[in-house]
Amino acid sequence: MRKGHTRRKVLQGTTAIGLSTFASPYIKTSHSAGKLKMGVWDHWIPGTNGALEVLLQKWGEANGVEIEVDFIPSAGNKLLLTAQAESRAGIGHDIYVHAIWMPTMFAHRLEPVDDVIEDIISSEGPMVPLAEYLAKVDGVWRASPSPVGSQTHGMISRLDLYKKYADINLQEIFPGPKQKRNSELVDAWDYDALLEAGQKLHAAGHGIGGPLAATGDASFWVAPVFAAHGAELVDKNGDIVVDSEEVRTVLEYLSKLVRTMPESVYAWDDAGNNRWMISGQGSSVFNPPSPWNVAKRDAPQFAEQMWCHDLPRGPHGRYRNFIPQFWGIWDFSENIAAAKDLLRHVGTRDITYQMSQVTTGYDVPLLRSHAEGNDVWAKAGPPPGAIYNYPIRGDEIGIVPGYPAPPPMAAQIMAQAIFPNLVSRVTAGGDSIDEGIRWAANELEAVMRG
């Protein structure tokens, strides 16, 4: 039986934010001035922060703007906690990073940037649809594309281990550049195939990995597994539907899959995937290519065996998390004109291209034209083609945790880590599947009540 609640109740329960607060009118000039404080994501890829700061400072010098940049790590939910503190206090950075659902969560304190987006799209072309879904709140753009940080969470696996212990040639299924995929091989890569491979790899001491603590990376891999099985927590109408056969089925599956992982996954933070692959024990994780990037420096013998590829197919399709990252302007900024000019600047192809070269393709552009003609994913190695399949190239559907719930509710599903907490309770916490579902339903009802 499915539990139902109206969309209106969900929106009422999760909208604990007031009316939008607009900054004082400003006069846009051809030459920005003043000072901008920026809080941006502390990038995983070595050298990225320094390269980004050079680009920002160069723009500042050319436009008479003093730029101050703070790089804020995602570990420990520091990005979200800092945003919450600044939003409540009405003081902090001028420009702040807003990933995934944060434009929805902080829409009441974010300056509208419709004019910025209009200029960027007029110059650069359209963004991926998911960007509008996340950053355009109630018809108003609240954030603009970040030049760094947008990413997908496909799989990254060890070619040698899959061949040796699971008899699977991942390069044959998901080949590199200038090679055509075999649709039959791709179709056969489903969640049953992953489970069978994971069991063999685990028995050989090389299990797959996926965090199950209350961390972003945990939601990023669990949510697509749910989606592929047609399992939803809240549907597109805002009704709580966690009490379903589809959810029971996916929890039964995950109870088996988790046994192919190390017990430490329940304590992993957002660096856990990297550590697992660089240790030499890991055979697969669900992650951007940061393990490969770091391994090139710290464990090159493992890096040369790593390969990015698609997630498995489930009964309801193949899904992958696409994690857009935006920059927004707090409405308490005292230099909104300069902040908007800077957002326009970093929304250009030249800036995106430069940063993609620095990150060796870790960042996936939100503007479609910025990915076209960029050969960074084809050129990167070793091995040649290692990250070619990191951008979505096949039949995967890009989603974000909480999909397909209305954005206000989906934002809370992500913030409350309901996906990994539910899986953890069932696979390690002693709850039966029915007990876990009842817990999740209660949590979702509490979110609705605000």
Predicted regions and their residues:
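Conserved N-terminal structural module of periplasmic/extracytoplasmic solute-binding proteins
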Residues: 2-107, 118-125, 150, 168-178, ...
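Paired acidic/hydrophobic, glycine-rich loop segments that form the ligand-binding mouth/hinge
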Residues: 94-97, 283-288
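Hinge/lid segment of periplasmic solute-binding proteins
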Residues: 99-154, 303-312, 383-394
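Short helix-initiation/N-cap motifs at beta->coil->alpha
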Residues: 71-82, 188-193, 265-278
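C-terminal lobe and pocket-closing loops
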Residues: 290-303, 315-421
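Glycine-centered hinge/linker elements that transmit conformational signals in sensory
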Residues: 191-202, 236-267, 311
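A local structural motif
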Residues: 61-73, 91-92, 171-185, 236-239, ...
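Short, solvent-exposed loop/beta-turn-alpha elements that line the ligand-binding surface or hinge
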Residues: 115-127, 171-187, 231-251, 297-301, ...
